[in-house]
Amino acid sequence: MYEVGDKVVYPHHGAGTVVRKEERDEREYLTIQIIHNDMTVMIPSDSADRAGLRKVIGEETVEEVLGVLGGDGTKMPKNWNRRFKHNREKIKTGDVYELAEVVRNLAIREWEKGLSTGEKQMYTRAKKILASEFMYALDKDEDAAEAYLDELLADSAADKAVAG
């Protein structure tokens, strides 16, 4: 299913490239180089889908994700602990739309009320994961992808805070 050179996304870590396929203990493993944090991950090929591994989105999907980022915030639990768990579960799905929702909602919340330390860390990590995917999908370098996302979020969150 995945070949060396494929651009993939691994939930919790972000986008990377399959750099190697190898047999170990009678099982095939994929080695993925995650670009934004210089991490290498090995995943058994036969459980890659279960682990949430998927190919990087294309330009068409980027447009849809931008729509999510620019959309209205969705209702989140008021309790910090519940909200944190709710967002963590969304990130864990590996779904780019769920990830974009978390990023958007935390950006709006940061603009309106500020974020707790834990939520700030989650927001930063979620943005890095999304930016790493934009990097491949839009053929940008890491810094340009992060700057692009930050600019979109600042404009959108400011608009939502003013409108809300």
Question: Which residues does each PLM region occupy?
Answer:
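Charge/polar-rich, low-complexity and marginally structured segments
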Residues: 46-164
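A positional/architectural concept
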Residues: 1-53
